[in-house]
Amino acid sequence: MRVLPATLLVGAATAATPAQQVLGGLQDFGNAVQDAMHENLPKINKPLEAFQEQLKSLYEAREFWEEVANAFPQNLDHNPVFSLPKKHTRRPDSHWDHIVRGADVQSVWVTGENGEKEREIEGKLEAYDLRIKKTDPSSLGIDPDVKQYTGYLDDNENDKHLFYWFFESRNDPKNDPVVLWLNGGPGCSSLTGLFMELGPSSIDENIKPVYNPYAWNSNASVIFLDQPVNVGYSYSGSTVSDTVAAGKDVYALLTLFFKQFPEYAEQDFHIAGESYAGHYIPVFTSEILSHQKRNINLKSVLIGNGLTDGLTQYEYYRPMACGEGGYPAVLDESSCRSMDNALGRCQSMIESCYNSESAWVCVPASIYCNNALLAPYQRTGQNVYDVRGKCEDESNLCYKGMGYVSEYLNKPEVRAAVGAEVDGYDSCNFDINRNFLFHGDWMKPYHRLVPGILEQIPVLIYAGDADFICNWLGNKAWTEALEWPGHKEFAAAPMEDLKIVDNEHTGKKIGQIKTHGNFTFMRLYGGGHMVPMDQPEASLEFFNRWLGGEWF
């Protein structure tokens, strides 16, 4: 059905005009009409202006879709993906050592400063439960001297069940901070971060755990969370297709965990993650900070090689692919020119997405920009996560090690030891990835939340300088472009050498750093998309120093 704009505008104006009243004479009637029109004109114009903006956005969206359909028809062969629920068997309550009921937490009332009754902890937690089991490390051979907990956060109202794995600090758990780790995707399990990057063990080609001396739980307790639902060991009868929907789940998990373990709640708490966590972390952090009455002692956030501000970051795919990021060019001159030519249109689409935040605009922006600026690199067969080498295993995001992790976590004895309720494990769920893309989440301007976060806590953006897909050039650029009170000083701050200071390699240059106020950017030499995997010593160095408060 097609409706002309003029018809709609006239109809709206007519509907907004007040009903006529019976007056004493024609002159009075005319004056009354003029007065009524004058009085109500702003009321008429405001919805008309809003409606005109909506029409403009719709026309623009139609143009975008037609352009994308003509240029990349293969990318529109998509229907919303409603994944079949994972096969699972819920364990009886008797299996778990603790079950923390959100309703019980919400039932605790205290007397506030004004003398009125208020909830001890804010948030809508009634539908949530947290199941907790102390895991026997000796049965897995993973950090056998470290206390571990596994379990599920249950959203009983929406049939969502998020799996987590907690490792206590190897050092001083009574005083060391607590960190939540999130992998990206969207749709990839944080257990890949555990076993490929920063956890207490890696998995070798024999599918056996190998001790990691550079694990991030060397001086911090770490929680690895499989989110959103239907990722890793998590499962649900429903689906999640945008970042905001997952924020309340994370707040509930942390609140109930710290309620059960107040000894950890007393410690400093930090959120860290990589890749699409550049979307997750600003949203999750804002959700936590929005609650004044909370038991989460949030002190800072860390985002590694993240996607946070697409408008700025997509500009740096061409430079990184064409030899301007510190490594040899991957693409030839013709491909580089093609990317240059496509950039302007890509950015105009992203700007429209930022203005409307509508899926109708944001989806074609993602499709166009990814095909124009990412696909030329992907077609070379080079690893998008590391410009220094080829993609060695396309079925496992270029890394054979990811296949080892999946094989290990699919072992029945491993699933039994950690209390997993699903019948199988996949490192990444690509249905979720597509759903996030086709709901417009990929290009949304979540970087706009960062200034509000900086008002309250420090933020570290770090980037391995060999990554292509979330490269250091783009991450440095968006941090320097971000509008916040310290913008000018941060942008003008020089990049200084980052050196090891506390081991036998003292003085070794591991990267560059710039900082002002609560904002810090780091470039890590020789790190790809997964810095802790590529540069374990350097990553533990900056991680420990960041948690120690050296730069804030």
Curated annotation (Swiss-Prot):
Record keyword Disulfide bond present: yes
Protein name as it appears in the record: Carboxypeptidase Y homolog A
Changes seen on gene knockout: Decreases strongly intracellular carboxypeptidase activity.
Function statement: Vacuolar carboxypeptidase involved in degradation of small peptides. Digests preferentially peptides containing an aliphatic or hydrophobic residue in P1' position, as well as methionine, leucine or phenylalanine in P1 position of ester substrate.
Family the UniProt entry places it in: Belongs to the peptidase S10 family.
Location(s) in or outside the cell: Vacuole
GO cellular component, one term: fungal-type vacuole
GO-annotated molecular function: carboxypeptidase activity; serine-type carboxypeptidase activity
Primary subcellular site in the record, as a coarse category: other
Signal sequence residues: 1-17
Residues glycosylated per entry: 219, 518
Keywords assigned by UniProt, alphabetized: Carboxypeptidase, Disulfide bond, Glycoprotein, Hydrolase, Protease, Signal, Vacuole, Zymogen
Active site: 275, 467, 529
EC number: 3.4.16.5
Disulphide-bridged cysteine pairs: 188-428, 322-336, 346-369, 353-362, 391-398
Catalytic reaction equation(s): Release of a C-terminal amino acid with broad specificity
